[in-house]
Amino acid sequence: MKEIEKLKEEYPLLNKLIATEEVFWVNPNMEKYETAIKDSPLSEENVKDAEERLKRFASYIAKVFPETKETKGIIESPLLKIPSMKQALEKNYEQPILGELLLKCDSHLPISGSIKARGGIYEVLKHAEQLALQHGMLTEEDNYAILDSDTCREFFATYSIAVGSTGNLGLSIGIMSAKLGFNVTVHMSADAKQWKKDLLRSKGVNVIEYEADYSKAVEEGRRQADADPSCYFVDDENSHDLFLGYAVAASRLQKQLEELKIVVDEEHPLFVYLPCGVGGGPGGVAFGLKLLYKDNVHCFFAEPTHSPCMLIGLMTGLHDKIAVQDIGIDNVTDADGLAVGRPSGFVGKTMEPFLSGNYTVSDEELYRLLKELADTENIYLEPSALAGMIGPVKVCKEDAYLQKQQLMEKVQKGTHIVWGTGGSMVPEDVMNGYYKTGEALTILEK
């Protein structure tokens, strides 16, 4: 315990985090892009390689997931202006949001309805491609739609895939692996929602449930895979492939911004707010965006007050050597996708020089924001997906970051993108429950 007391002295913000109060933290270790990229374990080439692989698989995806036909097998989500929500935020928080506000609707990504459809599906496809190439089932010049055959499914059925998840990553890995023919096991933590487990089982996925939290589910998944040479483990805590699958989102977003005639340059900064669990999804997206927009994009991670694992890891520099439970935080939150007690050391160390900051948000606030977005824009997200929504308010209100980066004059001409990470697959009765909770909390507040 002495070490914790020492940490609290060194990082006074820890006291607020321990009290589960909402905090806003500016990253003192952020560097200029050109310096940061020199020490990065990943590069633009890695992201381009991932992008090319997804293009090779597009004909297969379009064939087996009819909902992707229109986009020719490219798994992408809309970018929407949300002016009514912007007005509501300004009114409710008595804070003008300088610049335009948009929502990136990964909540409505085809196949698995969350940001995890990016990294999760990509990693499974990469593994399938490697196996098929090794065994002469495929060449890179082939039309990958040939993988949709009994022969290929029977081949993949001799291999298995395992993953530990609080929910959404499990959905992506499970749905994609089962479609290819793999035997797939998803190790689900205690906070995983029942409907997610039911949906996976309906797709022929083996779901193993744990009483413990996310870290335990990952540990068990890793153990199972270690004992079986034909089993591939998707390691959410350390996976470069997941990270790169998420990073591909950046070039897609760039095209969408161009279509909307939104400029990003030194005079027109871009601010992006990303809900963060273990870190792979937001880390990958932020990394991809930094490669494209360099010092003109400012990325913030958003975490629940009861699971601020990445913030604690980054602030203390201990990364995955510290868990929220070590300092007396319970890691219990309704934002199930973000209910992670120990961050990814790989993501924390990779993103440390690129990340602008991090903030926390309470479950109550997430529910109120959920209701507000439904009322103003008729868009329904799951609670964890609303963590980014309060970001523009926090950045404009606590202007320490804007001052430090000399953005006070520029923010007005800038753009804020809130990353809506999941929600379209939530069953109607569950979503109605979320909405009612938001309604009750809004009445209470007033």
UniProtKB/Swiss-Prot annotation:
EC class of the enzyme, as a word: lyase
PROSITE patterns to which the protein is assigned, alphabetical: DEHYDRATASE_SER_THR
CDD domains according to UniProt: D-Ser-dehyd
Keywords linked to the UniProt accession: Lyase, Pyridoxal phosphate
In-chain residues carrying the UniProt-annotated modification N6-(pyridoxal phosphate)lysine: 116
Recorded GO MF terms: D-serine ammonia-lyase activity; hydro-lyase activity; pyridoxal phosphate binding
Family: Belongs to the serine/threonine dehydratase family. DsdA subfamily.
PANTHER family, per database record: D-SERINE DEHYDRATASE, THREONINE DEHYDRATASE, MITOCHONDRIAL-RELATED
Protein name in the entry: Probable D-serine dehydratase
Species for this entry: Bacillus thuringiensis subsp. konkukian (strain 97-27)
Organism lineage: Bacteria, Bacillati, Bacillota, Bacilli, Bacillales
Gene this protein is translated from: dsdA
